[in-house]
């Protein structure tokens, strides 16, 4: 937790990487690029990658390259670049296994009310990042945070990722960021890619509006989010999961530089 808030300039922290681990070379390539970018901008950086995608619409959707293989790649990324790594878990028995390889355990939005899953993550002693459900009010997230703290684990963060707006769209209520900062008393992260999903497609493949990533990110920084979460890929069109709402890797540097400038203005007027 201290690392995430350690920027000498007061900058936000970043959780970023591919949606799912597709292979070692791909993971190391993305991590190397993001480490280079974030080090120049004084952004504390955490590599993100799912070792398995359990939440798929279609039975034939890609879920992963194998749990152990993907987890070993995540650990190698962390060791190679000396950075923390985050991955998500979906069942209680995954918590202890994943905790052997990564530094932060993430609870998916659809599972943010699952008490035993949250407790299992918290009891590993790892930091826990809980994504707010698309169906949940910001004011209710402190109950999920309380479950982590009840286990004696104070290292917790929450992530905003949009609210369901009808059957096939999401919107972001930016009031939720300061609301959760106040009620949860922990860092609040903005997921700037999943919040632009177009879920429940008739094809069974989630769509997105990636051209609005900069808009969502800028607004989140303007209201004082503590961290940014994003998924990125060299070529989102060939990504095996969630390519429709990823930010191309070659656009990350410019976006983060702009957001860093916005953060400087925010701090000037709030401190």
Regions found by a protein language model. Name each.
Residues 14, 18-26, 45-67, 232-243:
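Glycine-rich, proline-tolerant flexible connector loops at the mouths of alpha/beta enzymes
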Residues 5, 219-271:
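Structured C-terminal cap/extension of enzyme domains
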Residues 65-66, 80-94, 103-116, 127-138, ...:
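Catalytic beta/alpha-barrel core
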Residues 124-232:
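Catalytic alpha/beta core domains of metabolic enzymes, predominantly
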Residues 59-68, 104-111, 167-171, 195-222, ...:
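Active-site-adjacent loop and "lid" segments of alpha/beta metabolic enzymes
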Residues 11-15, 44-48, 84-86, 103-104, ...:
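Structural preference for beta-strand elements that scaffold enzyme active sites
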Residues 1-15, 72, 264-271:
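N-terminal amphipathic alpha-helix/helix-capping segment at the start of soluble metabolic enzymes
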Residues 33-41, 60-86, 121-127, 177-189, ...:
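Alpha-helix-loop-beta-strand connector modules within alpha/beta enzyme cores
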């Amino acid at each position: 937790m201290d690392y995430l808030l350690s920027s000498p300039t007061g900058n936000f922290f970043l959780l970023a990487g591919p949606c799912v681990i597709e292979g070692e070379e791909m993971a190391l390539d993305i991590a190397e690029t993001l480490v280079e970018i974030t080090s120049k901008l004084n952004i504390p950086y955490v590599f993100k990658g799912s070792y398995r995608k359990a939440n798929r619409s279609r039975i034939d959707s890609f879920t992963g390259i194998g749990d152990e293989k993907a987890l070993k790649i995540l650990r190698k990324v962390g060791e190679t670049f000396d950075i923390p790594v985050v991955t998500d878990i979906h069942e209680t028995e995954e918590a202890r296994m994943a905790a052997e390889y990564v530094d932060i355990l993430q609870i998916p939005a659809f599972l943010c009310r699952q008490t035993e899953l949250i407790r299992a993550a918290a009891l590993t002693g790892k930091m826990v990042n809980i994504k707010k459900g698309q169906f949940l009010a910001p004011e209710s997230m402190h109950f999920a945070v309380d479950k982590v703290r009840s286990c004696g684990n104070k290292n917790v963060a929450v992530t905003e990722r949009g609210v369901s707006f009808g059957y096939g769209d999401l919107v972001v209520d930016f009031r939720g960021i300061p609301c959760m900062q106040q009620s949860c008393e922990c860092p609040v992260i903005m997921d700037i890619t999943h919040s632009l999903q177009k879920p429940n497609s008739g094809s069974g493949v989630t769509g997105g509006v990636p051209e609005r990533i900069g808009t969502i990110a800028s607004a989140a920084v303007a209201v004082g989010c503590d961290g940014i979460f994003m998924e990125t890929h060299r070529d989102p069109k060939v990504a095996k999961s969630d390519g429709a709402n990823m930010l191309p890797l070659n656009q990350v540097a410019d976006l983060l530089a702009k957001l860093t400038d916005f953060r400087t203005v925010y701090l000037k007027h709030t401190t």
